[in-house]
Amino acid sequence: MSRPRRRGRDVHGVLLLDKPQGASSNDVLQKVKRIYNANRAGHTGALDPLATGMLPVCLGEATKFSQYLLDSDKRYRVIAKLGQRTDTSDADGQVVEERPVTFSAEQLDAALESFRGETQQVPSMYSALKYQGKKLYEYARQGIDVPREARPITVYELLFIRHEGDELELEVHCSKGTYIRTIIDDLGEKLGCGAHVIYLRRLAVSKYPVDRMVTLEQLRELVEQAETQGISPADLLDPLLMPMDSPASDFPVVNLPLTSSVYFKNGNPVRTTETPQRGLVRVTEGEENKFIGMGEIDDEGRVAPRRLVVEYPL
């Protein structure tokens, strides 16, 4: 007889985890889920095992709104090793080509400029994108190369930090879907020497405050502290969470009176004053402005429900 599935607690919000190097995003997600004893958890855009930095982990009802973080801008600090190209475009792969580093400062400036603004990027074979239902890296590990279409990306800012010997350090502010490994691989080809990533840190996601990031070790220390004090770990862990609607913070807010919100929460579009002309909105209710879900302005100017909060902490 199978054992009954253990149910976690209903905790809702977004933890800004500082992912350690060497761990997969899913591994650290599961650790956070266990530490919080959460019934649901999901991350918002995987980081490579080599990478560190901000990994927003959505708990409970916040998982419904994680898509908006997948669509948000990101900022990275990256160090590339010049003169070597690898099959994965990072230090975890095998070196497939070595060339001397001979470019000038002017050539570097020109190469960097070519990546700024709106461009097209062909994703790496070592990525989680899917082709015919299978992830690209699964094909790559079998030595199979499959066709990949170039996708539009935007590099809002590409800052030169330093060039010392065979290392080049940059800071990148980019749109969703941008692969930093691919930028470095393409840059190495433009410079004629090849390059791969040896250090990558995600500095920021959307507008989340960097000083709210916490490590797994800090979470474990809080659990131990709670046990020492004889209190629930939730008393120390839950204050670390950002609001469940924070993934959608870029969208305007529409507040509904309680007389209207009951219809909205039952799946019906409602009319209200001072709504945007179109697009998605965050919907709150009452004088407390309690978040109740995402809506979209329909053709009649009503707020139609799109994603609703089912459970909400008291």
Curated annotation (Swiss-Prot):
Role: Responsible for synthesis of pseudouridine from uracil-55 in the psi GC loop of transfer RNAs.
Q: Which Gene3D superfamilies match?
A: Pseudouridine synthase (3.30.2350.10), PUA domain (2.30.130.10)
Protein name (record): tRNA pseudouridine synthase B
Q: Which residues form a coiled coil?
A: none
The keyword Magnesium is annotated on this UniProt entry: no
What molecular function does GO assign, one term? tRNA pseudouridine(55) synthase activity
Is tRNA processing found in the keyword set?
Answer: yes
Binding-site positions, substrate: 43, 76, 179, 200
The catalytic activity, as recorded, is: uridine(55) in tRNA = pseudouridine(55) in tRNA
What EC number(s) does this enzyme carry?
A: 5.4.99.25
Q: Name one Pfam family in it.
A: TruB_N
Species whose genome carries this gene: Enterobacter sp. (strain 638)
Keywords assigned by UniProt, alphabetized? Isomerase, tRNA processing
Gene Ontology BP, a term: tRNA pseudouridine synthesis
Q: Which residues cross the membrane?
A: none
